[in-house]
Amino acid sequence: MRRSKSYEVRDPINIWNKYDFAMSGLGKKSKILAKIKHFFKCVKWSKQRITRGYCDCDVWEMFSFLQTLIPDMLQTLKDTRTGSPGYLGENYTNENGILVNDTCHEEWNCILDKMIFLWREAEKDTCSQKNPFDEAHSKAMDEFTERFGLFGNELQTEKELEENRKRGGGGTIHFMDELPEYKEISDKYREEEKRLEEYRRKCKDEAIDMIKQYFYDLWD
């Protein structure tokens, strides 16, 4: 599975992605000025990528950057390589009496495919397993927000409002699962998210184990 190129999903590899440009103007008085400033940051980061191989924004979310970069590089290695590790496959004598080993290529392909798959499964946006309750949970959240506000403001009690006034402002946050009509979908969604997080963590661990095993073979 290739990583998404959609507008909603941030692409950590592409410094000039549309998502970051859109977010740069969020909450700013002048969105145009904010986007211009972000443009010059992108120029700076591009120069850093050229001179040292990574830029400042890569470090901010290093795990996400590597989770995207590594499978992309593995895919390129698989697609463009000219050889395979010679210790893979089996040696045999061909019809001309020459000892050869061309079965290593298929075995190396399978190994690379598995590494690519595991790295992509370890990243939420490219993972093949999705939360089946995501749509229902989002719909319930939209309904909750419309009825009670983003942070459940309308559910605040008189006592909470009074305590907040004494503190000088602020508010008490109320969550969707506090209400009986939303508790079931909230619990189902949360439990599935825990399962998916554990699945992605296992994929990450297995992917790293394979990188350790074949680390010195990752060249062409």
Please state what every model-predicted region is.
Residues 1-214:
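Long, non-globular targeting/processing and low-complexity regions
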